[in-house]
């Protein structure tokens, strides 16, 4: 196969993942309001796609237009391919919302009322709502030499209003801009009595369209057109000019709201001359214009399921399983000292991790606590426990990653609070994101210091721990806990990388470990021995790993990859990858765990990791891979993390050589296997 065809386009692969998410919104087996949520997830993902990936392609085209990307194409060619795929996905999304979801919701008494369908009583209520809630806070900006075109915030809802007449100062009118503040809901619930006892919603854009004339008394409104600008959201911090990383991040967060435009969304009814006017204002081309049949921001519909009390239209509630042994002992440290604990979230509760930190804060025998924070949410019992530990006089060190995309402001806030509580807060190593998920507790026991560590595949975030699937290990293993201590010393101090006993770390040893393990399986296959690699991750795009997997496949290694999102490897290509199979599982839970398995002539080497197989994870982040050696825990990771995922024939998608996906289905006579439901049955409370 030609060199340029061995690697698929990562952006097209990411859009293909979102097509699989959209399939959840189409699936009649998914509860109706959850289908609406999946529709919103696609919109949110697309926003980030344009803010990050499309923005990167545009920058790359400007910087080096002739350079070929990993997929063998130049940036301009890739932009054209990606734009076509994005348009197709967005059209499909709006068709689904308008022609399928809205009618089905209406049958359940959940209505989105358009202006043409408002009853007189609804019109009266909506006008009162506008006068009471909107009119006092809206600020129209008329465009003239003293009022230049305003800079809309990233992803904000705006309206271009065409006017006729002269204002109070005798100025001829032409156009004004109205910006809808973000504090306003994008969908407004109507009183039940106005909706026949059901649930009714109106779009904020419809309310503004109906009453925008009140912002321009005495003027004639000729047209009102919603638009939304998506901007490049990359944060750039110059190391040479850097004095204070936290202050620099705070400044960049403000600037990000006004980055270069990458996408303009308008309704499909917007006239051509308005579209051209807006494109000119934002220095965009027609290729960057997206006309949609409906509201320009479907993301904000995610409020609707929470406003509708219909359990029959939502997923059933699951209760995470709890460690029975934890209730029988006074201390989690006593339990871990006996044997390590493996947690599989969300099927098993995240509470033991929280309890470990709470106990560390209150236990007089605990001398020091260390933890990394990448994403943790706006409310975190874990961070509160760290603050309590610091206030209690313990040595608390927290590595806060300020560059966690779209969580920067939240992490800056936590860093301030932790410092005020007396914790030592460091921001990692400039140029390397700290993505490793690790915590360390140092305790004095019988006159000697004893370490306890938690290492996970997911964030210290109680909210996502109920949605994302992840593994976590709590251990007192002396070599592993010593390794974790070395990693914290590397991050917070200065010096050469320490020699680790069991852990592997990026950017120093993890990539080499993966390449070496693949090569070892390759040699075993050449020698006629059984050889197998099974791995689960979010993304696989690192070219040298892909080439190593191709070599392994050619040697006869059987390779099964469970890749939820981007995968730029081509599976099943004769002479290249016929022994590689790739599947993606998309369901209620977000598959997030990273698990690596290498047969190794029967030793079954198994790791849990924070790292996907991407260049950034191997070379530009601080990551960990932890071996699972305890026989029972290894058996669980292989079975729950890999085997059950390979058996799934309900939510699995099978990747094809061209990068497309086909949904798996039970073979004739085969029973259904549903990874996530089966894990709830196996592990849930």
Swiss-Prot record:
Annotated protein name in UniProt: Polyphosphate kinase
EC number: 2.7.4.1
Keyword field contains Kinase: yes
A UniProt-annotated Pfam family: PP_kinase_N
InterPro entries membership: PP_kinase, PP_kinase_C_1, PP_kinase_middle, PP_kinase_middle_dom_sf, PPK_C_dom2, PPK_N_dom, PPK_N_dom_sf
Cited SUPFAM superfamilies: Phospholipase D/nuclease, PHP14-like, PPK N-terminal domain-like
The protein's role, per its UniProt record: Catalyzes the reversible transfer of the terminal phosphate of ATP to form a long-chain polyphosphate (polyP).
Source taxonomy: Bacteria, Pseudomonadati, Pseudomonadota, Betaproteobacteria, Neisseriales
Key words of the record: ATP-binding, Kinase, Magnesium, Metal-binding, Nucleotide-binding, Phosphoprotein, Transferase
Post-translational changes noted in the entry: An intermediate of this reaction is the autophosphorylated ppk in which a phosphate is covalently linked to a histidine residue through a N-P bond.
Top-level taxon of the source organism: Bacteria
GO biological process: polyphosphate biosynthetic process
Residue sites binding Mg(2+) per the record: 375, 405
Keyword Calcium: no
One CC-aspect GO term: membrane
Residue numbers annotated as active site: 435 (phosphohistidine intermediate)
Binding site for ATP: 45, 468, 564, 592
Gene Ontology molecular function terms on file: ATP binding; metal ion binding; polyphosphate kinase activity
Reaction catalysis annotation: [phosphate](n) + ATP = [phosphate](n+1) + ADP
Class of the enzyme per the UniProt entry, highest EC level: transferase
Family membership noted in the UniProt record: Belongs to the polyphosphate kinase 1 (PPK1) family.
Cofactor(s) the protein requires to work: Mg(2+)
